[in-house]
A protein has these predicted regions:
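Short, glycine-biased loop/turn motifs at secondary-structure junctions and
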Residues: 1-324
Length: 324
């Protein structure tokens, strides 16, 4: 990430510390293995065999369940120690948790369909692991923040993932979120990655080849929204062959226009039409976002369709002073 983050007043160097969560350098395998071996030692376990993989997704086939005779597996005992550590400390800041755990690690985790079991995030545990704590156990976790990607401790073996080759973000209020309009927002050395549009995880086609046909076949409304935003409404309307039925000034948003289009029959929806409007509130960059609403096919006038979306009649909507 090139932009700086808002510092947390409790930890003067939190911005520099959180940079580890977005580091794209190769893992420091020696440091990571030493720290993990020391954590195993705290559990009374010998150093594990280390298996390095090139992405979290590549870890899945390498993971094996703990032996049936193990009443308390290594990962469960480690989780108990982590819970005790975290009881004494809060996350570094709400922004740190939102940016690192929810906006980045959360989207990467959601992109892996298989169950991962207990695991830790290495560099992306930076949201709760403090720098320079002076606590010997926490310092081992801090070493992992500085040294590697995600990791999975198991009986006698530990699977560790390399860090990504790229992590692309954009500001989102006081935090950051994944976004890339040209390729994966997160990409790992084996080519596996995660595509994201303004913080929403999307299939690769949304970023790399959005088309009206793919948008119309997509069931997920958020994916459709992102794809249309990326393609652009003008291109979508042209590709989809939508016919403009009516247009009218938007009384709830002076200076803007409502447009009502006829929609062709679609598999997932009852007969409907598309109302194209402009958001009444201003985006962070000062622009107003165009958006589309699917409305019942019974409406022939955009004011009636817009009023329906607010639970109003067209006549009532026409008397609005300003909407948001």
């Amino acid at each position: 990430m090139s932009a700086s983050r808002r510092p947390d007043r409790r930890i003067p160097d939190i911005s520099a510390w959180l940079d580890h969560a977005f580091c794209t350098d190769p893992a420091d395998r020696v440091a990571a293995e030493d720290a993990i071996s020391r954590l195993y030692a705290l559990l009374g376990e010998p150093p594990p065999q280390f298996v390095w993989v090139l992405s979290p997704n590549a870890a899945v086939p390498r993971l094996r369940p703990s032996p049936a005779l193990s009443l308390e597996p290594v990962e469960a005992r480690l989780a108990t120690r982590v819970a005790a550590l975290r009881e004494r400390r809060r996350d570094l800041s709400p922004e740190a948790r939102q940016t690192v755990k929810e906006a980045v690690a959360g989207l990467v985790r959601a992109a892996i369909p298989q169950t991962l079991g207990l695991h830790w995030y290495g560099q992306q545990d930076a949201y709760w692991v403090p720098p320079g704590s002076g606590d010997p156990e926490l310092e081992l976790w801090a070493t992992l923040v500085r040294s590697c990607g995600w990791w999975w401790p198991r009986e006698g073996v530990c699977v560790v993932a390399e860090r990504p080759l790229a992590i692309r973000t954009e500001p989102s209020g006081s935090a950051y979120r994944l976004h890339s309009a040209t390729g994966p927002a997160v990409v790992y050395p084996d080519g596996w990655g995660v595509h994201a549009w303004h913080g929403t995880r999307v299939p690769s086609w949304v970023i790399e080849d959005p088309t009206a046909d793919r948008i119309n076949r997509e069931f997920n409304v958020e994916v459709r929204r992102c794809a249309v935003e990326h393609l652009g409404w003008a291109a979508y309307i042209e590709q989809a062959g939508l016919r403009l039925l009516s247009r009218a000034p938007d009384p709830g948003n002076p200076g803007c226009e409502l447009q009502l289009y006829n929609l062709p029959p679609q598999k997932w929806h009852a007969p409907s039409r598309l109302l194209l409007a402009v958001n009444g509130s201003v985006e962070r960059d000062g622009t107003r976002r165009r958006y589309g609403l699917r409305v019942p096919a019974e409406f022939d006038h955009p004011l009636d369709a817009a009023g329906w979306s607010y639970g109003l009649t067209g006549a009532q909507y026409a008397r609005l002073q300003r909407r948001t």
